[in-house]
Amino acid sequence: MERIVVTLGERSYPITIASGLFNEPASFLPLKSGEQVMLVTNETLAPLYLDKVRGVLEQAGVNVDSVILPDGEQYKSLAVLDTVFTALLQKPHGRDTTLVALGGGVVGDLTGFAAASYQRGVRFIQVPTTLLSQVDSSVGGKTAVNHPLGKNMIGAFYQPASVVVDLDCLKTLPPRELASGLAEVIKYGIILDGAFFNWLEENLDALLRLDGPAMAYCIRRCCELKAEVVAADERETGLRALLNLGHTFGHAIEAEMGYGNWLHGEAVAVGMVMAARTSERLGQFSSAETQRIITLLTRAGLPVNGPREMSAQAYLPHMLRDKKVLAGEMRLILPLAIGKSEVRSGVSHELVLNAIADCQSA
């Protein structure tokens, strides 16, 4: 069992990583006997895990209600959020309730925002079931729903009480979802840890076959890096922005193509190549390093070119609505070397469009 602590003073919390955690009531601390829980999951995961998690919580004396959401990025919306509020109010659940998010990034982000908003804030626990959510979205307190004009535009910073990562969940993950998660894994190597990127080049095949020790190390290292960044910059005023490598471009793809048609990790993979091409055009990143990124993403089963039906010009309106925009100016996360990156302002739209075009016709 691995345990990492996100250090945020009195709001610090543990990330527990192991197999078989759904069999152990202690995995769901700080829940105690007699407490009330609303378990939020989706229609795909409910048949796999709902009864198991409900059973282990009830074994610990916890009173469990549940709400099952439709599955898909297109349901990360205010309308679906309202169904969670309605379920909480109908029981009713008070301010002493705990929301448990059992699912991937959509369930985790939406449940976290529900917890931040319901009666001005209730406790919640993240139980991520996808690789992407285990290494990224469940850690750090970013909660949100989407708007038709932009991804994650309505949300709050709100930290969980704990994160429970059961590695056994990955055994039921479709290959496309596994690849999507690997995009976020590769991101950490590009922006923060060149040695980890090297390790990924050597061990990607082991990750693709869900080798236990390799996957445990991979998730632990990603969570360590995320925890360090969040502890230093919880509300993304500086360092934490680096975690958005590829996201400015990627969110544009997701919004333009319709939420759910491209998985988040697929869009981020293309976005990271576009960021690398932008950095190349600025003369601060080598084509050889871009090729290393492309090769690793391709081996992981991820796209490296943007959708053909989306013109370079179609990216700009979405990118100019990005949450990192300041004074109307885009701020891009760009690699400087494998393992080093920067936040860059003042890049001309023409250069960005040319970098996007590099990835459309490649």
Curated annotation (Swiss-Prot):
Enzyme class: lyase
Annotated CDD domains: DHQS
One annotated GO biological process: chorismate biosynthetic process
Protein localization: Cytoplasm
Any Pfam family the entry gives: DHQ_synthase
Protein origin, superkingdom: Bacteria
Cofactor: Co(2+); Zn(2+); NAD(+)
Binding site for Zn(2+): 184, 247, 264
Annotated InterPro entries: Dehydroquinate_synthase, DHQ_synth_AroB, DHQ_synth_fam, DHQS/DOIS_N, DHQS_C
Biological or metabolic pathway of the protein: Metabolic intermediate biosynthesis; chorismate biosynthesis; chorismate from D-erythrose 4-phosphate and phosphoenolpyruvate: step 2/7
GO CC terms in record: cytoplasm
Chain positions recorded as NAD(+) binding sites: 71-76, 105-109, 129-130, 142, 151, 169-172
Family statement drawn from the similarity comment of this UniProt entry: Belongs to the sugar phosphate cyclases superfamily. Dehydroquinate synthase family.
Protein name from the UniProt record: 3-dehydroquinate synthase
Annotated source species: Escherichia coli O81 (strain ED1a)
Gene that this sequence comes from: aroB
